[in-house]
Amino acid sequence: ATIHYSTENILSETKKGPLFDPKFIFYKTEHWKLIDKKSRESFEYFIKSFKKNIEIFDTPSYFKDIHKYHQIIHETDLANNFSVYFKKFKKKLSKYMQDAITRGNKYSAKEYAEAIDFIKRSYESYQEVFEDYHGVLSPASPGVAPTGLKSTGTAEFNKVWSYLGTPCI
């Protein structure tokens, strides 16, 4: 439910605290092993501190296929959206982009359609979580972004949530 307050009452209402105790779900996915020590310690401390609001569950089995399907969609879309640039200025693209576009051009329409269809099937399986929980907690990254401009780091922790289109904090 959405509750609206006038600006004159918003501070006093905020000081009262939340209207309900939010409940979150957390999975230590297979990518948890990538997280750096400080980030792991911080996340585990946060989970322990708010244990009445956070439940830890085993990762659903179909999550393991999401990274594969996410890659098919991502690389096929890159190949489609950068096709003209790739043909004319391939050498100006990073090696990562060149490789991703090359792979994206090799996926069949069937593989792409399966990857899109798997979103719907996965979300249908997962949506019941939001009957009992308000959101998912997940590290955004394994730690601080690398120095320099060559990489922004890894998106492994966010791929599942991006693929499913679900809220994640």
Language model: regions and residue ranges:
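A short helix-breaking turn/cap at a secondary-structure junction
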Residues: 1-40
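Short helix-loop capping/hinge segments that flank enzyme active sites or metal/cofactor-binding pockets
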Residues: 18-23, 27, 69-127
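Histidine- and/or cysteine-centered catalytic micro-motif in compact active-site loops
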Residues: 29-30, 59-61, 140-143
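Short, acidic Gly/Pro/Ser/Thr-rich loop/turn segments
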Residues: 31-34, 87, 144-145
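Acyltransferase
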Residues: 35-59, 82-88, 112, 116-133
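Short connector loops at secondary-structure junctions
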Residues: 53-70, 101-102
